[in-house]
């Protein structure tokens, strides 16, 4: 079976071609600021990115012959985890999405390209809006603001399944805490195959991260909103985009920050240690959801490469459960394996409604 995987990100479009579970081509098509600045809205980049995918396949002599095309899922309405076939309802919701992100282009490009091939199907898998929260986890102190989830569902679930396979068991039989350490940070409580509690890692909950603010003091945030000093869009960027490490230290580059610390930068040390402290505190809070009965804590994402971060996290959390580290992320493989499982009948294909 031949699969095409498409993963649009903020500044790049990653593609991969798989023959069954073997990658035959993996490419990261980078987009310059000048290229993207010519588009008023992210959704307007659709044709541009689609054509780049086709050109990359042609440049590498890859025949345009696929059994399915799987795209990164976008910011749809909340849905359970799993594999979904792209349909008209999904496309309509993406075209009118309340939140914008390059990931919204994944299902659009997959659907458009699949339509060119007889019998080819278009899928998404485990988008960031996967919502399997226990009802008790949704309730906040204000009925106006129930909790929502936007998190690294694809990578968290892939790492959880990988851990299960390594330990000769099933994801659906485990109680895990999975922490994705990237530009955003999500801490998920996985109970028997479902993420029953997880923070909104995009715009306003959990630990602060390289570019996101995490949970903020509500009263001060209201005062700032009403101060007249910032527009709505400016404030949103101060919550997600120009927040966290980059707001404090002017960079999201953790290795560079660690070098500053080694050179005696006490402010950099205080800020990075504060982020680690907040991550550990969130993991500790997550342990309560499972009554302390945790099979393992899994740390993944780009920052899991940092010995500085991982060593200090382990000091604070290793008393809770065994800690396993899976640096980086492989969303391309996760998407491919989900699509392959759907084609083989090993995973159910769900209908988006």
Predicted regions and their residues:
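Adenine-nucleotide phosphate-binding core of ATP-dependent small-molecule kinases
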Residues: 237-291
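Conserved phosphate-binding/catalytic loops in two-lobed NTP-binding clefts
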Residues: 307, 311-337
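Glycine-rich phosphate-binding loops at beta-strand->alpha-helix junctions
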Residues: 294-313
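Glycine-rich phosphate-binding loop plus the immediately following alpha-helix
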Residues: 105-112, 139-175, 183-184, 192, ...
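Short glycine-rich, Thr/Ser-proximal phosphate-binding strand/loop in the N-terminal lobe
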Residues: 3-44
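Short beta-strand-loop/turn "lid" adjacent to the catalytic site in phosphate-handling enzymes
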Residues: 57-102, 121, 129-141
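Phosphate/pyrophosphate-binding loops at sites that engage ATP/ADP/AMP, CoA/4′-phosphopantetheine
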Residues: 53-67, 165-169, 283-295
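General beta-strand structural signal in soluble alpha/beta enzymes
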Residues: 68-71, 121-127, 177-179, 197-198, ...
């Amino acid at each position: 079976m031949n699969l095409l995987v498409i993963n649009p990100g903020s500044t790049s479009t990653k593609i991969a071609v798989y023959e069954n579970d073997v990658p035959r081509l993996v490419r990261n098509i980078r987009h310059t600021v000048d290229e993207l600045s010519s588009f008023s809205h992210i959704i307007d980049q659709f044709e541009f990115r689609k054509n780049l995918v086709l050109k990359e396949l042609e440049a590498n002599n890859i025949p345009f012959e696929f059994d399915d095309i799987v795209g990164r899922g976008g910011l749809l309405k909340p849905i359970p985890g799993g594999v979904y076939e792209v349909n008209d309802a999904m496309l309509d919701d993406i075209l009118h999405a309340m939140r914008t992100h390059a990931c919204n282009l994944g299902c659009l490009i997959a659907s458009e390209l699949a339509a060119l091939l007889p019998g080819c199907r278009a899928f998404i898998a485990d988008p960031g809006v996967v919502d399997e929260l226990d009802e008790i986890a949704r309730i906040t102190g204000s009925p106006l603001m129930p909790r929502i989830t936007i998190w690294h569902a694809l990578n968290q679930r892939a790492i959880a399944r990988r851990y299960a396979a390594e330990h000769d068991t099933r994801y659906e039989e485990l109680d895990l805490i999975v922490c994705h350490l990237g530009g955003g940070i999500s801490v998920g409580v996985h109970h028997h195959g479902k993420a029953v509690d997880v923070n909104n890692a995009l715009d306003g909950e959990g630990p602060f991260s390289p570019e996101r603010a995490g949970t903020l003091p509500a009263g001060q945030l209201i005062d700032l909103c009403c101060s007249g000093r910032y527009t709505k869009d400016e404030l949103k960027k101060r919550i997600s985009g120009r927040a966290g490490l980059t707001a404090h230290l002017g960079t999201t580059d953790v290795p560079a920050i660690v070098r500053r610390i080694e050179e005696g930068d006490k402010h950099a040390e205080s800020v990075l240690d504060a982020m680690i402290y907040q991550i550990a505190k969130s993991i500790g809070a997550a342990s309560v959801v499972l009554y302390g009965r945790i099979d393992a804590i899994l740390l993944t994402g780009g920052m899991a490469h940092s010995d500085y971060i991982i060593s200090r996290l382990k000091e604070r959390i290793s008393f809770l459960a065994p800690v396993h580290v899976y640096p980086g992320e492989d969303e391309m493989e996760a998407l491919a394996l989900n699509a392959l499982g759907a084609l083989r009948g090993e995973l159910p294909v769900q209908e988006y409604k």
